[in-house]
Each structure stands twice: as structure tokens, then as C-alpha cells.
Amino acid sequence: MIRTTILALPLALLAGAAAAHTKTDATTPADGATVAEVEMLRIAFDAPMRVIAAALTRDGAEVAIERETGMEPVEAFHAVPAETLAPGTYRLDWRGMAADGHPMQGGFGFTVAE
């Protein structure tokens, strides 16, 4: 019984480490926020992430953004709207590759007030 426990403990610890994936720490604007204007779109991660694709949409239609972060792994992704955002509800969706090689995706929404 003790031998089984001793052998199982390292496996349990490895499984926990393998299950830990990069997570979003914060976004700008904050998820669900209502703001007057948006000068910068930012996603902060708890570990380096290579953001492969990012798309901003309003009512399902894509809105142009200019990436300020390259394709290298970063702890914070930055982009700016190509034009001033009109009032409405927006969503920024992204796809990326975590440092451990796992594909990741996420997104957040915000509203620009009139």
C-alpha cells in the first residue's frame, strides 16, 4: 500500500502541472465594461502566449484593428482600433499557442457608450 502511494504521488503531481494552462489575467477594456472610448485593446496572460489571430467584431461584423504585438510569445497582447469605435457592443476573440504547445482561445466583450 505504501509503495503504491509513493509511486502514485509523482504521477498526480505531474498531472496537475500538465493541466495548468495559460490563462487571461486581465483585459482592456475590462470584460463586460461600458466605456466612453477605446484607445487600446489589451489582453494580459499569466504566462507567455503567441497570439496567432485576433478579431474585433460589432454585431457580427469585423472591425479593423492594427496589431501592435508581433507573433512572438508575449505576456500582453496589444492592438488598436484602426478607426474610432462607434457606440455599440463589441467582442474581441483571439486564438493562440501557449508555451506548453497547447492551442488556446478566448475573448471578451465591452460596450462603447453613446
Predicted regions, residues:
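Bacterial N-terminal signal peptides that target proteins for export
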Residues: 1-9
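N-terminal signal peptide c-region/cleavage motif recognized by signal peptidases
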Residues: 15-17
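N-terminal edge beta-strand
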Residues: 19-36
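Exposed loop/turn and edge beta-strand positions of beta-sandwich/beta-sheet ligand-binding modules
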Residues: 23, 39, 75
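Solvent-exposed, flexible loop/coil residues
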Residues: 28, 39, 108
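Acidic, low-complexity Ser/Thr/Gly/Pro-rich repeat segments typical of extracellular/periplasmic
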Residues: 42-114
